[in-house]
């Protein structure tokens, strides 16, 4: 339908259903308006499980032994509608798991396998995910059998892990607990391209200019182009892409080689046919195809005639067993460029022994050349990667250990701390990339700690700002950051410009002393100080309140912290404290929206927090923009009252700053940023601002502010769930 009149195959016009078209949406009419949709995704209206369903409790009821046994059996239970290569689905399942987890990028923590997002657009229809819809359909009988006790997200990841076990690898472990989403994610920026595989993400030859936060080199790819840079083979240039891409997934060179080699030790590429015979991707497929895409309705299109990437062949001699054959073939043979039957570039060995060739997927009497992609040849030709590969070749046990750990990291990187892992196979070892935090003391005298904080010389602004800065690093995307651990006192956070190091040092010196005197953790005292500041500010406004507090945060140490990995959590902007590190191409209000989504806040929570923080005097470096009150430090609704007062007029000043003048007298009353003004400009945000500006909602404002504040402070308290 085009939004006006639909026309079915029978030609019968209808006038209903127009609002299902994106062409008539508000964003189509006003594309530059602030779109708050990313704050309201994944709510209960789209979730069929009901508000009382708790997957993390339900999965604990799973018969883990029987479930894994069924997964093992599935690997060799070939189905005629989509037969298994060599009678084993391992390669297909690993590719599915890999491409789910591999969409993770460290810059914003988005992507990854933690939500089952591969079931939805755009991932379910990416060119790099051709035929992974078949893998998920093969899993459906198991999902159907175990029902609510297993999420699609967990099942998709575990299928790859079980596949490796089935083929002989001793895996490192597995943690259940990934919760499904029920519609496409709106917050993930996959790139600006309007066409698949568009080569627009780099502007230089050294391949270092990939736009942040992206990790894949082209739209629709998980990693790099397997044929070469922009489809042109050049292993050393591809090596640059590989290093950047895997680095943006938080993988070092050794992990990169291990994952590439381990992923290509089993399974095969599919390109024995003509891609033009493939039908449309799942999102564009005919209704009778029932969500399956890339269906070949012209030729056979399955088994040995399958077309996926277009490259054709296996990497190793024995593609259904874990061994060291990848390095044997890669390092011991010379390779030359060839074209696959589908027309894709691939590398094939020169003068290979017949016994080193893998057999045909259907007829073991037939053997074919193995293949390597340009990324594989990058491992051979890049000097750093080559050295690692040679060590793995000489020490298969070491390779297996490094790969098992790297696979575990790949498939668990976006799950957050180890406390979120569920099940009998969770490794006991703490890993530094899990950002470990020790358990904290819960038995100290909270009232005594609050009394000492209140008696200190810290201002309300200092206490609230420090607590906010400690907690605001939390990312709901990969569950990193937050106040637990008090890493704000460690490198690199203690030196971040956004944390005002001079002010932070002064405040921490006092709070660390209070922690030592009371037996509380510094992490707890930082949050408690913010609460004390809010309680004092509310009391000054005439409201006696107690801000909820849950003790038990621990204090991380430098030894528990990979300082470099925390660089990506540095705030470069914070609309809540009215701060930008520098001018950006993206509008300040959009930057605030992105941070709000990562913190897991809604639009009205964002609204009430900004209004409250402004009057508490928490602006970065004590700037006065947006401080629409003459009672700084008192928790009033003055920000909203003055924002919505038509006695004021807003005049552009300079550099995205504005003057608030008296409409009659013309005198300047306050200054503001775009972040301040958007709460009066955007129709949705203004509706919230008007609620908090009402005379009868002063108490509601404080109540809602405290609730949103507590949500931020406890966002990383997975031990409370």
Swiss-Prot record:
Signal peptide positions (record): none
Oxidoreductase is among the record's keywords: yes
Catalytic activity: H2O2 + AH2 = A + 2 H2O; 2 H2O2 = O2 + 2 H2O
GO cellular component: cytosol
Cross-link (Tryptophyl-tyrosyl-methioninium (Tyr-Met) (with W-98)) at residue(s): 223-249
Positions with a binding annotation for heme b: 264
One example GO MF annotation: catalase activity
Cross-link (Tryptophyl-tyrosyl-methioninium (Trp-Tyr) (with M-249)): 98-223
One Pfam family matching this protein: peroxidase
Enzyme Commission number(s) from the entry: 1.11.1.21
PTM text: Formation of the three residue Trp-Tyr-Met cross-link is important for the catalase, but not the peroxidase activity of the enzyme.
Positions annotated as active site in the UniProt record: 99
Biological process terms in GO annotation: cellular response to hydrogen peroxide; hydrogen peroxide catabolic process
Cofactor binding remark: Binds 1 heme b (iron(II)-protoporphyrin IX) group per dimer.
Site entry (Transition state stabilizer), positions: 95
Cofactors: heme b
Alphabetical UniProt keywords: Heme, Hydrogen peroxide, Iron, Metal-binding, Oxidoreductase, Peroxidase
Similarity remark: Belongs to the peroxidase family. Peroxidase/catalase subfamily.
Subunit structure: Homodimer or homotetramer.
Task of the protein: Bifunctional enzyme with both catalase and broad-spectrum peroxidase activity.
Protein name as annotated: Catalase-peroxidase 1
Organism of derivation: Legionella pneumophila (strain Paris)
Gene: katG1
